[in-house]
Amino acid sequence: MSTAYFMGVDLGSTTAKAVVLDDQAKVLSAHIVQMGAVSRRGMEQAVESALASAGIAQKDINYTIGTGYGRRLVPEVGRTFTEITCHARGVAALFPEANLVIDIGGQDSKVIALDEQGLVDNFAMNDRCASGTGRFYEVLARALECDISEVGALAMKGTKDLEVSTMCATFAETEIISLLAEGADPADVAASVHRAIAHRALGLVAMVGKRDGIIMTGGVAKNPAAVHFLEAALKQKMQVPDDPQIMGAYGAALLALEISSGRQITQYDPEKVQALESKVEATFNPKNRSIPDCISCQK
Amino acid sequence: MGHDTKNALQILKSVANNPQSYIANWKEKNSLPVIGIFPMNFPVEIIAATGALPVIIQDSKEPISEGNSLLAEFYCGYTRSIADQAAKGMLDIFDAFMNADHCIQLLGSVDVVRELLPDKPVYFEHLIAAMDDSWTKTQVQEKIEAFIIEAERVTGQPISDEALLACIQSNNKNRQLLRNIFAARRNGDAQFSPAELQAMIVSSMIMDKNEHSALLESVLADAVAKPRDQRIRLHLSGHFCHAPRVELFELLEDCGAVIVDDDLYTGARYISTDTKESMPPRMALADWYFARNETIPCPTRVQKTVDWDSYLLNALDNSGAEGVIVVMAKFCEAHMFYYPELRKTLNTHNIPHLLIETEHEGMPVETIRTRVEAMIERIRRKSPTRQITQESA
């Protein structure tokens, strides 16, 4: 029976994630709430669900670390870390051989180089442009009139490499519509956009330097086509955690434990990780992944 | 901070934020011309020696509208802002303009001023950028003479060596006062915020130097040293021609950093070098141009004996800065060309650094915040003495 509990909360641009660890760094629960936009209620729901799954109350949490764009909104937060540090920490714990993290979230993408200790060595991120982020895939799905969860499977069926020159998330929609108007197969359009986005990500990778041991995290890593085309662009296989979206919150929870206890968690323990994976899968309720009625439908 | 310090600082901030108001008041009071100076190397003592007020033209915070039709969007924000100010009548207050620097974008904006304000003299002499050539020194001396002749012509006032020397002395005194404040910051005194320091420099670029020095003395007389705290120490580097937005400074400090040194034009670079009072004044002004590049090398100058990266490494040693924030004005060609060299040096010496590209309009605050905080976390987590425990977080 654990005597101390630690929480990591990642409030991103489109989802809120919460992970609870015990004092042995074992994952007790992890929860994701799809919000569509930064939402205090969505974050509260992720926290409440994670606490409920772990069978503990907020008062039982010894230390909480917030991360993501909304990190300062996290209640009871001990301190905050950027998602760069947290994704690096989470990945380093699960993949000791990792040297590079490609994290593509709802509104930004980051490439993080890790040193031998798993600490951030260098990083690059998009700043003014949503190209290549989750938002871009949402634009694609909307233009193709399909659900965001279907766009990857559709892209995997594409066989032609069509010219997609616009990398602006706003203007891309008109280019996609134009291709469809010319009679292009939606699968080819989806594949071509994925391919173009992958090359955009390659630019970020080049900024910190490509290296072996690449792990992809963030919500976009759930899209098999995004992973496939990025691997093709990199000419290199990547590893993807079973739930890549939770990696920032997991890293934050690890940091909460480490800062609170003053000890570094260095041992890779598959059992602890398994808990993370299974719990996350169990909480992946289609209801809480829709936009934006996920919150109202949970009430 | 005492009452006098606050008042004096408030005046300096007010001038920095609203140069037009100060210039209008100065003109009304003195009935003398005001000459607009383009950055970076024009020796303002020449203008001051005529009795006129030299004012280094500042970037306006106003969004660029009319200026967009005058200069292409790939001109830097500062030069487009000058074009915009010229189009909106904001430069009408100046009686003439002088420029000594051959930046192609700056020359574009000078041309706009010349075109839109045809009745105002606009004078350009190029202070040669190749510092080592055998003919450079002679040519710079000739250019200084040409500036003096033009300043006499425009203002109708002859320039004596005595008047030049007096202006050199007042500028040196002003620079020395400012350098004392910057040296105190470098040595661990955090009594003034980066925004306050920038206001001191920018107001010096606008105001009569004696008046400015008097205010500075008032600020210093009442100032109380404030020991540096445990925040991560950063050096700000770049921005050769104009002031970065103070919002950026505030964001950096909000992220848990303290700026301990810089090489910004509106910072240490502007006050780096005095003009020698022991030399004949005209020669001393030419000498200042060369000496300045040796004190803080500028990537727009070519000099084999000095380079910016070596200077930067030395500056980091002196201030104890743990990282470098490179602030690059978008489309600044000189900076863009030099930056890979700088990055290579910083990487070789394992110095954390972050490039922030600035634009005239819009600052992606949250993404910059994330990048700066990530850099600070990287420095903290890699330094055993910087590890934060729950108790100290």
Language-model features: where?
Chain A
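Acidic, glycine/GT-rich loop-and beta-edge segments that sit at the periphery of enzyme/chaperone cores
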Residues: 258-299
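Glycine-rich phosphate-binding loop plus the immediately following alpha-helix
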Residues: 38-39, 117-160, 168, 254-258
